[in-house]
Structure formats: C-alpha cells, structure tokens
Amino acid sequence: MKKEILEVFDNTFPGRDYTIEIVNPEFTSVCPITALPDFGTIIIRYIPDKSCVELKSLKYYFLEFRNAGIFYENITNTILDDLTSVLQPREMTVITQWKARGGITETVSVTWPQKQ
C-alpha cells in the first residue's frame, strides 16, 4: 500500500491527551486464497502527538486495499505500521471486524506501542 498518500495536519492541542476515533464501515479487500471480496469495518483509535491524519487522504489510502489480495491480519498490521510511521502518535489501536464468510466472523486488533 502507498503510505505516501497519507497527509497530516498539525495537532493544535499537543499538550493534551485526547482520543480520535475513525470508523470506516465500508472497507473492502480481496481474499488472497479465493480471490473473493472481503468486507469489513476498520476502527482506528489514537492519541495524537504533533499531528493528526487528514481524512480524505485516509479514504484514498483505504482504497489502495480494494483490489489487493491480502489476509485480515496483514491488513490490520499494515494499517497500524503505516499510520504510526506517518503520525508518530502517543498511542494507537487498529481494530478490523470482518463480515461472515462461511458463517465465521473475525476481529483482529493491534495496539502500538506494545504493552510490556
């Protein structure tokens, strides 16, 4: 995915811890095994430091996954890695909730920094 698409703007309250939650209920990708579409919800929660992610750029970043054959776990970790490298937040959690396939749903979550 092209993390260069992601744009940021200055956090005007860097001295205060507050949480930003972003939800994308229409995320799509492709199963790398079956080539069938996968549908999910992406939830991003973060405490910004010096910058915040600009939402239009995030939308276009998400569209990069639309035709990519990629596993749920890889999507979740890639989003976290890309956003933390661009934003350098104080804390971030990415949760992906996937629609049922064969009657089974999956939720994947990852947090940065990792708890010791």
Swiss-Prot record:
- Output this protein's name: NADPH-dependent 7-cyano-7-deazaguanine reductase
A GO molecular function held by the record: preQ1 synthase activity
Outline what the protein does: Catalyzes the NADPH-dependent reduction of 7-cyano-7-deazaguanine (preQ0) to 7-aminomethyl-7-deazaguanine (preQ1).
Catalytic residues at: C31, D38
**Keyword field contains Iron:** no
Q: Which residues bind substrate?
A: V53, E54, L55, Y72, E73
Organism placement in taxonomy: Bacteria, Pseudomonadati, Chlorobiota, Chlorobiia, Chlorobiales
Biological process according to GO: queuosine biosynthetic process; tRNA modification
UniProt xrefs under NCBIfam families: QueF-II
Q: Provide the reaction this enzyme catalyses.
A: 7-aminomethyl-7-carbaguanine + 2 NADP(+) = 7-cyano-7-deazaguanine + 2 NADPH + 3 H(+)
Q: Which SUPFAM superfamilies match?
A: Tetrahydrobiopterin biosynthesis enzymes-like
In terms of InterPro entries, this protein maps to: GTP-CH-I_C/QueF, NADPH_dep_7-cyano-7-deazaG_red, QueF, QueF_type1
**Protein keywords:** Cytoplasm, NADP, Oxidoreductase, Queuosine biosynthesis
